[in-house]
């Protein structure tokens, strides 16, 4: 059992030449939401599978876009999965377990999780002290597999050989031009990756997300 943020989100998009290794997540997400870089976007697919017998822990997603109605992959959540492109579809992992069990006092980065065969329970320990135990049916296993998808061999070579990569300078210039065309007043950032005025303006210009005020306490 654990809490989960109520907000739906998109996973960070990768582009030819720009990814986690050289570009901050806020910029990748902004570029993805802007729709200005589809010619550079790396297409991906994910398979997510759950093995869980406890309460809540469902998966909410917006297959018709952020303005469309959400759908919920509900129970039974045992050996059940989805094939998705989570860089393009808003989604959220719903909180797991009963609300009164989601906080774990004493949990730390050094805490350990182990199975105790003598009691048929899973135990969380911190510095050797047991702070929480779970029955097997309360445990949830989630497997998330991701792959890049290519139309043909020419597209594979374009990515592998870096013959048509996007650069940070190209990305910033394209964003600035579009923001100004939309009427957004923004100055020329001297350091766009750290210029808070530019960052706020870019995020505000391209922010889009579903509403989640319909979530109740148990599910959210």
Kindly give the residue locations of the regions a language model identified.
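Conserved double-stranded beta-helix
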Residues: 1-57
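Catalytic core of Fe(II)/2-oxoglutarate
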Residues: 56-204, 208-217
